[in-house]
């Protein structure tokens, strides 16, 4: 019987006993204690314990709080029996004033003088034994992703680091945790290569194990987390991706070690990364203790299956996937069905394809700075009136919701439309249809690099001004380049459409094209994503308290949804602007009349949102 194989058959209690005896066969605990949760441990002076516990509750993704001991307590009854936490881990780290000063196989072995790295700190007396130091300390136990590895394997998902006989790869990101007191640090993540075809399996399995960090916090390009090179992890070993694998990142409890280092507390101890405490808690458990009455983050005793996240590809370059709950996906699919009906026979089906709406909403949700571009002329003669009635309502609906979500929004139009569009936008602000004025730009067609210069700072494709371009009623996004009267307008593709086409080749900028009604649906879809806890957790990387959306915030988002009243006011403004209808080519006076079909679409879109709870939280 091989040594590694025999260890994998042992129970957590048997493995803890071997570690207490300093068995040299046990180092990294990944792959051990199948079917049980593992935990990280942090020993801190009692005076820092309250702040550190609050730090954990403010950053529940990486710091899944399991148990806090009493001062000097070496056992942890809710997690395991017959435990001495001073000896039952294979390797410990000793920290002094923000530095790792040594590693130990047992905290009971350290009785010599503990050197102090900072001249500003009081030195630890040589006569003080470790037991005296530990008597003033509190031990905090945190969840570990090793706890979901066996479930992944059972579901057919390869665990590459175990296959390769390595510790998991751990990286310091540039994403800041929510600070509390002296504790402030960047998020640390683990990376596991997952076959693209098995992403949803891995997401669901880990979501169902919240004690082991839950679902991933990022899937795709490491640079989006500030990780420059996967071959150089900050902790653990480099794990090789196999063909077809995607890098998937989970929040990691080693974040706690980074917090200890940055806090520069005089003395602290922890497990060594990858050398975890083995609990007796099954990996199927979602909670281990009853929350205290005043707990800000009570554990989930029952996970709602409708909130199970699904993964969706958002961008190839850079590679980015997003997560959203089954419930939100179903509602956005319903929105998509409504706008795909084209009741006014305006040719909007040319701008519609299955799953486009969800992709558009996810791309916008991940964006910070968005440019909304407009449709092109639908007449051959520049002297004739132009069709901008089709895009303005949808563009304003998108802009309203994006602004309420705190994103930067810029409207971009053809220079021939500038004066008219500005007047309409200003009037929309005055009427309260548009929440606030937004920058309005044009693309000059006098320069061959005009589109690139507008999209990127100084025309440098590595410095894009926007991370998403959405084209409303932009016929260049249709495969036949035709207007709604089925006339080919390819020869009329102007600077605005050139902007959209140029953006598609710039890394870091995603693009989508929607119809006018698609603009309304996007606004509703963004509302659904921002009230979806699974999606919000992913956007926030598992950081921040997991509380329900405030009523004030929810009301603001609701106020910025499309409405029948807003559409009627905007139609009135458009009718006064001398525009013509894109389908008939006739005056807008009759064509812009608010019809029962128009009322019906908006009402049905809003009904999808209001059905059931306003928020999934």
Predicted regions and their residues:
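Metallocofactor- and cofactor-centric catalytic cores in central/energy metabolism, strongly enriched
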Residues: 2-145, 189-250, 254-258, 262-426, ...
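Short linear loop/turn motifs
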Residues: 162-172, 273-277
């Amino acid at each position: 019987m091989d040594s590694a194989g025999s260890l994998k058959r042992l129970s957590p209690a048997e493995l803890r006993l071997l570690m207490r005896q300093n068995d040299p066969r046990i180092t990294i605990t990944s792959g051990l204690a199948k079917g049980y949760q593992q935990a990280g441990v942090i020993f801190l002076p009692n005076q820092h314990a309250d702040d550190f516990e609050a730090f954990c509750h403010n950053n529940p993704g990486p710091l899944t709080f399991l148990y806090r001991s009493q001062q000097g307590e070496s056992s942890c009854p809710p997690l395991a029996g017959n435990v001495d936490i001073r000896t039952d881990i294979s390797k410990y780290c000793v920290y002094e004033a923000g530095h790792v000063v040594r590693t130990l196989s047992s905290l009971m072995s350290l009785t010599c003088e503990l050197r102090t790295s900072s001249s500003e700190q009081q030195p630890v007396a040589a006569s003080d034994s470790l037991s005296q130091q530990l008597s003033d300390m509190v031990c905090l136990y945190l969840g570990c992703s090793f706890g979901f590895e066996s479930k992944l394997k059972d579901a057919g998902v390869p665990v590459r680091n175990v296959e390769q006989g390595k510790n998991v790869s751990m990286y310091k990101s540039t994403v800041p945790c929510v600070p509390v007191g002296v504790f402030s640090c960047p998020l640390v993540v683990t990376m596991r290569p997952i076959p693209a075809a098995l992403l949803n399996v891995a997401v669901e399995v880990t979501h169902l194990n919240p004690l082991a960090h839950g679902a991933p916090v990022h899937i795709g390009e490491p640079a989006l987390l500030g990780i420059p090179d996967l071959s150089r992890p900050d902790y653990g070993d480099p794990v090789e991706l196999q063909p077809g694998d995607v890098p998937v990142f989970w929040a990691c409890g080693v974040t706690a070690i980074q917090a200890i280092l940055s806090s520069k507390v005089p003395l602290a101890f922890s497990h060594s990364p990858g050398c975890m405490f083995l609990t007796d808690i099954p990996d199927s458990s979602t909670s281990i203790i009853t929350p205290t009455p005043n707990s800000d983050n009570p554990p989930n005793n029952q996970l709602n299956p409708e909130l199970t996240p699904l993964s969706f590809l958002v961008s190839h370059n850079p590679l980015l996937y997003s997560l959203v709950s089954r419930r939100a996906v179903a509602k956005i699919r319903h929105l998509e069905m409504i706008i795909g009906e084209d009741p006014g026979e305006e040719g909007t089906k040319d701008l519609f394809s299955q799953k486009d709406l969800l992709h558009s909403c996810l791309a916008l949700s991940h964006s910070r700075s968005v440019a909304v571009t407009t449709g092109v002329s639908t007449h051959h003669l520049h002297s004739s009136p132009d069709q901008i009635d089709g895009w303005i309502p949808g563009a304003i609906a998108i802009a309203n919701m994006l602004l309420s979500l705190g994103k930067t929004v810029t409207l971009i139009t053809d220079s021939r439309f500038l004066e008219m569009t500005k007047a309409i936008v200003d009037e929309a602000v005055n009427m309260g249809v548009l929440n606030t004025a937004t920058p309005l730009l044009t693309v000059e067609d006098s320069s061959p690099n005009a589109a690139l210069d507008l999209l990127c700072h100084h025309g440098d494709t590595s410095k894009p001004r926007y991370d998403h371009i959405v084209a409303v009623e932009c016929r260049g996004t249709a495969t036949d380049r035709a207007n709604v009267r089925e006339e080919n307008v390819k020869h009329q593709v102007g600077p605005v459409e050139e902007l959209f086409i140029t953006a598609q080749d710039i890394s870091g900028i995603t693009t989508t094209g929607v119809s006018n009604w698609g603009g309304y649906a996007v606004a509703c879809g963004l509302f659904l994503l921002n009230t979806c806890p699974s999606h919000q957790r992913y956007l926030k990387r598992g950081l921040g308290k997991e509380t329900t959306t405030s009523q004030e915030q929810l009301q603001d988002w609701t106020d910025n949804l499309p409405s029948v009243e807003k559409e009627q006011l905007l139609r009135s403004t458009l009718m006064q602007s001398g525009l013509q209808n894109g389908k008939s080519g006739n005056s807008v006076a009759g064509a812009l009349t608010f019809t029962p079909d128009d009322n019906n679409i908006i009402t049905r879109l809003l009904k999808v949102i209001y059905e059931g709870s306003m928020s999934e939280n």
